[in-house]
Amino acid sequence: MGRMHADEHAIDAALVRRLLRGRSPEWADLPLTPLASGGTVNAVYRLGAGLTVRLPLTAGGAGDVAKERHILSTLDGLPVAVPVVAAVGEPAEGYPWPWAVHTWLDGEPAVEGRPAPARELAEFVVALRALPADGPPAYRGKPLSSVDAGVRRAIAELTRTDEPFDAEAALAVWAEALGAPQWTGPPCRLHSDLMPSNLLLRDGRLAGVLDWATAGVGDPACDLIPAWNLLTAATRPVFRDAVGTDDATWARGRGWALAMAVIQLPYYRHTNPVISANARHVLAQLSCRPVPRASTARRGSSVRAPNTTP
């Protein structure tokens, strides 16, 4: 598996230890394990039993460190655990950007198509929406029309690959989403990257939510994406009923799920098997391709393809 991004910075355990020795020497000799991740923005290492080190892979993710630190300080009252920022490091040792140490959250990442607590996930989304809606716009809290050109390019690109893909079906889903009435209510608090690898399960229950750098306020549709990137036809209605949403918001949420999948699949199909498998699951749930084989669990970080992913 090659690099995901052309401008990706080389990161290894030796670099992480040097950074720790300069910033937090008390942690520098703890066991350090790279995490197999579905994320696309950070390299993530488990540090000892109770910490993780998160290092942006590209300049595009460098601003996430400060943003996520602030967001995580505003999430009191949620029904699940979120990480706590234990330290922030400065550029050093040839590494050019800020980096962070977070607390470790116990749990296994959710996996698309496997049993998932649809009702608890909906309760989390509702609880997040109930928090004060102050802060910057969420990464995906904007109108779908803002990513229309990129989605259409990605659909055309997918038709030129060997991926089983029904472009006509995808365009129909996209047209319905674009045609749905826009959100006219007050902005809502959003995570905006509720990928399975960011949802931690323990004993079959939702225990934690990771990777808050894309969070903010906006149209609540984007936090409906687990209905397609995690759940199936059997559990989607449970999620929809519990989250409580109108037809227009549901259609826009389906549009966000499609947009992410069609852009991620051609970009990551040879470099990130976790994200690629998830995109295939989404497209199958939207009747745009055959049902794929089951994926495996990986802890993720924020999912974005620089300059392409909505």
Language-model region placement:
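Active-site acidic catalytic loop and adjacent metal/ATP-binding pocket
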Residues: 41-47, 53, 85, 174-224
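Hydrophobic packing residues in well-ordered alpha-helices of helical domains and bundles
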Residues: 65, 117-121, 170, 258, ...
